[in-house]
UniProtKB/Swiss-Prot annotation:
Belongs to the BRX family. Signal peptide: none annotated. Residues 221-231 have a biased composition (Gly residues). The keyword Nucleus applies. Residues 185-259 are annotated as: Disordered. It comes from the Eukaryota. This is Putative protein Brevis radix-like 5. Residues 250-259 have a biased composition (Basic and acidic residues). It is found in: Nucleus. It comes from Oryza sativa subsp. japonica (Rice). Residues 206-220 have a biased composition (Low complexity).
């Protein structure tokens, strides 16, 4: 018996090959679908980016216009008027501050000189560029007291005026008065003078120019009007001039001579009014005592305390004595 397996074997191989072909085709289809999904996603993202670009551009334009708008509004409200600026500080120049600017410039031109330690001079240059104006004089308290400052200015006034070309203008009365007042305030007052000094002094008009009722304080050393106390430079005496000396010539002397006895009977002496206070008293026989000079000891009184004492006791002394 002859059996042939060729036909049967060939049919099975064809079905197997067909099955492989079907599986291969199905796999290709699946791969193609997956790739298509990725492509669709990419195309979708590209469309979204294209749609968002105009919106972003519009937002940027709106933001830029919002930032520029205030400047444009300011330019429109200015009415086309251009504002001037300073070349040095780039600040706006206004037309209404001419006087203030001039005063500020005058203040900027002032300068301070220190001719000696503790002495400060505030100077302002004049228009000629050579001379200066003296604005202020300041003394340091730790170096000078009131009396030392007065003495320094009295001794160095001419030297300072020559050194810094201080000129007193003739055409400026206000400045002239200010300088004169400053000099009068800084110079020490005239101390008490004795009767012998007044006798030697030929010029009696100067002594009679002071009012009898005026009391001026002398910060310097003084000499008593009688024979009791005489002061030299550095004397521990503070003098108070209460009246002009009656032995010199003047209107006061003429009036006194009409109502009083001869000058030969006039007497003066020194009394100690209280500890550290010496008064020079003068009188005619049988007449009221006249207070000629008040002197205070430097050991007990300083410059300020002496002035305070005089203001507190002036009325009482005026009640006891005639000035």
């Amino acid at each position: 018996m002859h059996v042939c397996f060729h036909g049967g074997g060939g049919g099975g191989g064809g079905r197997l090959a067909k099955s492989f072909n079907v599986i291969s085709d199905f796999t290709k289809i699946l791969i193609g679908r997956r790739g298509g999904d990725h492509a669709l996603a990419r195309r979708r993202r590209m469309r979204q980016c294209k749609d968002a670009a105009p919106a972003a551009a519009a937002a940027a334009v709106a933001s830029a216009s919002a930032k520029i708008a205030p400047e444009e509004e300011g330019e429109g409200g200015g009415g086309g008027k251009e504002e001037e600026f300073c070349d040095k500080c780039c600040s706006a120049l206004s037309g209404g501050g001419g006087a203030e600017e001039e005063a500020a410039a005058e203040g900027e031109r002032e300068w301070v000189a220190e001719p000696e330690p503790g002495v400060l001079l505030t100077l302002a240059p004049r228009a000629d560029g050579v001379s200066n104006r003296l604005r202020r004089i300041r003394f340091r308290e730790e170096v000078f007291d009131a009396w030392a400052a007065q003495c320094w200015w009295a001794d160095n006034h001419d030297r300072i005026a020559e050194l810094y070309c201080l000129v007193k203008p003739d055409d400026d009365d206000d400045e002239e008065e200010a300088i004169a007042a400053a000099e009068a305030a800084m110079l020490p007052a005239t101390p008490c003078q004795s009767e012998a000094e007044d006798d030697d002094d030929d010029d009696g008009a100067e002594s009679s120019s002071r009012s009898p009722s005026t009391s001026t304080f002398s910060g310097g050393p003084s000499s008593g009007s009688g024979g009791g106390s005489t002061g030299t430079l550095g004397s521990p005496i503070l003098g108070l001039v209460t009246a002009p000396n009656t032995t010199g010539g003047g209107e006061h002397d003429a009036v006194r001579d009409q109502h009083q006895p001869t000058a030969a009977t006039w007497r003066e002496w020194v009394e100690e009014y209280e500890p550290g206070v010496f008064i020079t008293v003068g009188a005619y026989p049988g007449h009221r005592l006249q207070l000629r000079c008040v002197e205070l000891s430097r050991e007990k009184f300083g410059e300020v305390k002496a002035r305070v004492w005089w203001e507190e006791n002036k009325a009482r002394l005026h009640h006891l004595y005639s000035f």
